């Protein structure tokens, strides 16, 4: 019997990419596969993301893993390179880079490279995390055009800070600023990530960058991915390793944080924070056992968590438990825990077995 296993539905992945294409038909797709494919497995996701025109990663190591696995499509470093010594690696492996600061620009100007690097100039349109400020934009464009180490034409991108908050004007302001700055430019542009392409169609430029939605997880609080026409790619399961009777008034788990109000049965499931399931999950967080939702009862420990199966439960050792997936949206679990689906799927540890199915696997 397996312990915790993440089942990855590659047909759902392909469905989701097709859905992105339906919603942004005029845009090319840069599938974002950073953080080990959002916890789904970098190489498997890239291999089966058939609708992707390019891939976006955060770290050069991720780009090199993709190249080593046989990926030949364009790859972009979304944070750019970290040091001048990275530039020859980009050239050798045909990796594109974001440029967002003076230090990166100077490194390009001073480098001696065999061939130019494809550069995306990142503009700070209002998030104020990475990117050149609007007043720096023209100077950066001019210097990049003059730099022999930069392939032409330049490309341009920015990132939204509040695209998941539909009642804010911030996204409209960022879009208008970016479009104004890049008006008349020769190169391709990218503005929309998941929330942008779903909710702000005016941000669907030459490229869109689906991340979390590609994995069937919604970027929005008020709508699940299923409601948006997407399918969950990951289903996280484990098994009951014990079913115990607990009397009214007895407490369960470390710290005695849950006390039974009745005689009941407690199920012990083989998954815990050592597998990446959050210790912060409170009492009442739902788990699915034999097709019904049951609440977490007691503190999540390193290797186990406990649920209240109810006094009349017929569940047995070895029965399956679903932590999130087809029958329990990860967005719902995240809401109970006070986090976001992104964090849950990316924090699974190496103890969790990955099992891929669908799409000819």
Swiss-Prot record:
InterPro entries linked to this entry:
Ala_racemase (IPR000821), Ala_racemase/Decarboxylase_C (IPR009006), Ala_racemase_C (IPR011079), Ala_racemase_N (IPR001608), Ala_racemase_pyridoxalP-BS (IPR020622), PLP-binding_barrel (IPR029066)
Which Gene Ontology molecular-function terms are recorded?
A: alanine racemase activity; pyridoxal phosphate binding; serine racemase activity
Return the Gene3D superfamilies for the record.
Answer: Alanine racemase, Lyase, Ornithine Decarboxylase, Chain A, domain 1
Record key words, sorted: Isomerase, Pyridoxal phosphate
- Annotated positions binding substrate: 129, 302
Q: State its role.
A: Catalyzes the interconversion of L-alanine and D-alanine. Likely plays an important role in supplying D-alanine, which is an indispensable constituent in the biosynthesis of bacterial cell-wall peptidoglycan. To a lesser extent, is also able to racemize L-serine and D-serine. Does not act on other proteinogenic amino-acids.
Q: What is this protein's name?
A: Alanine racemase
Q: Which organism is it from?
A: Vibrio cholerae serotype O1 (strain ATCC 39315 / El Tor Inaba N16961)
Task: Recite the lineage of the species.
Answer: Bacteria, Pseudomonadati, Pseudomonadota, Gammaproteobacteria, Vibrionales
């Amino acid at each position: 019997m397996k312990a915790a296993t993440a089942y990855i539905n590659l047909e759902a992945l392909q469905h989701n990419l097709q859905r992105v294409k339906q919603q942004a038909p005029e845009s090319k797709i840069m599938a974002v596969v950073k953080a080990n494919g959002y916890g789904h497995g970098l190489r498997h996701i890239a291999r089966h993301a058939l609708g992707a025109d390019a891939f976006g990663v955060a770290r050069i190591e991720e780009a090199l893993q993709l190249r080593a696995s046989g990926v030949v499509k364009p790859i972009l470093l979304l944070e750019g390179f970290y040091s001048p010594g990275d530039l020859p690696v980009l050239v050798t492996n045909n990796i594109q880079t974001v440029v967002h600061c003076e230090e990166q620009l100077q490194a390009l100007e001073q480098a001696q490279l065999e061939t130019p690097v494809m550069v995306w100039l990142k503009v700070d349109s209002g998030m104020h995390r990475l990117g050149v400020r609007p007043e720096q934009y023209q100077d950066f464009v001019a210097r990049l055009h003059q730099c022999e180490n930069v392939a032409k034409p330049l490309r341009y991108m920015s990132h939204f800070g509040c695209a998941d908050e539909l009642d804010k004007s911030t996204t409209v302001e960022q879009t208008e600023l970016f479009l104004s700055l890049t008006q008349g430019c020769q190169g391709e542009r990218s503005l929309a990530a998941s929330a942008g392409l779903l909710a702000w169609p005016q941000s669907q430029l030459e490229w869109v960058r689906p991340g979390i939605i590609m994995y069937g997880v919604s970027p929005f609080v008020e709508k699940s991915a299923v409601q948006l026409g997407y399918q969950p790619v990951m289903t996280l399961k484990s098994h009951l390793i014990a079913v115990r009777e607990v009397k009214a008034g007895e407490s369960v788990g470390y710290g005695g944080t849950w006390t039974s109000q009745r005689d009941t049965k407690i199920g012990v499931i083989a998954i815990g924070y050592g597998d990446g399931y959050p210790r912060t999950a409170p009492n009442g967080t739902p788990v699915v056992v034999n097709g019904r939702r049951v609440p977490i009862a007691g503190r999540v420990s390193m290797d186990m968590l406990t649920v209240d199966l109810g006094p009349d439960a017929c569940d047995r050792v070895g029965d399956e438990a679903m932590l999130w997936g087809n029958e329990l949206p990860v967005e719902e679990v995240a809401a109970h825990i006070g986090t976001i689906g992104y964090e849950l799927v990316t924090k699974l540890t190496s103890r969790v077995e990955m099992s891929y199915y669908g799409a000819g696997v």
